[in-house]
Amino acid sequence: MYVVIMGGGRVGLTLANLLISDGHDVTLIENEETLCANAAVELDALVICGNGTDIKTLEEANISNADVFVAATGNDEANLLSCILVREYSIPKIIARVSNPDHEEAFKKVGIDHVISPERTAAGYLEKLITRPKVADLIVLGHGDAEILDMEIRSSKVVGKRVGDVSPTDKYIIVAIYNNGDLIIPQPDMVLERGTKVSVLVKTDAVKEATRRFTG
């Protein structure tokens, strides 16, 4: 899948890293020189220092071949304008980050597929919305107080322990285990081995705690 992301801030950069690690092709557009330079160093992807509201920049990003476009800057007006321009290229999926909830209706009126409000702008949620839309529906619960994290077990705190000894807690629950790419429903007596990939439903305020718990 080819994804073009506009915005090299925290959300855009983290989203790009998640997609790249999943094997997707990514181009990131950022017009602020420092952020652009940082992204170019961090990402194994094409980084374009330019304005995503400029057609020339979008075409440099090969926008016509994109499967997904994500407007992830903190500027609602720039996000809206870029999405309007990108619609002309018939991109299958367009996603816009909206910082001010009052602006959501404007995005919807111009036909943007997915308008993501502040409580849903976690990069993990956006990544699921792109790669696994059905899973994304499960991620944000209530008013955005939980999300699903995909992690590889590396911490000695959980390696060798049974699922039932680790999960559930009042902060998180293991919802899936992956074995050679196959999804397995966790059972209490399953042993967690180093390198095993798991999906964990975590309360938003416990994301750092859960990440340390499973990855060290």
Swiss-Prot record:
Ranges where the RCK N-terminal domain occurs: 1-116
InterPro entries hit by this protein: K_uptake_TrkA, NAD(P)-bd_dom_sf, RCK_C, RCK_C_sf, RCK_N, Trk_Ktr_HKT_K-transport
UniProt protein name: Trk system potassium uptake protein TrkA homolog
PROSITE patterns documented for this protein: RCK_C (PS51202), RCK_N (PS51201)
The keyword Signal is assigned to this record: no
Cysteines joined through disulfide linkages: none
Chain segments annotated as coiled-coil in the UniProt record: none
Entry note about domains: The RCK N-terminal domain binds NAD and possibly other effectors. This is expected to cause a conformation change that regulates potassium transport.
GO CC terms in record: plasma membrane
Gene3D superfamilies the record matches: NAD(P)-binding Rossmann-like Domain, Regulator of K+ conductance, C-terminal domain
Source organism per UniProt: Methanothermobacter thermautotrophicus (strain ATCC 29096 / DSM 1053 / JCM 10044 / NBRC 100330 / Delta H)
Residues that bind NAD(+): 7-11, 30, 73-74, 97
Keyword NAD applies: yes
Domain (RCK C-terminal): residue spans on this chain: 136-216
Sample GO molecular function, one term: potassium ion transmembrane transporter activity
One Pfam family here: TrkA_N
Transmembrane segments: none
Keywords attached to this entry: Ion transport, NAD, Potassium, Potassium transport, Transport
Function description: Part of a potassium transport system.
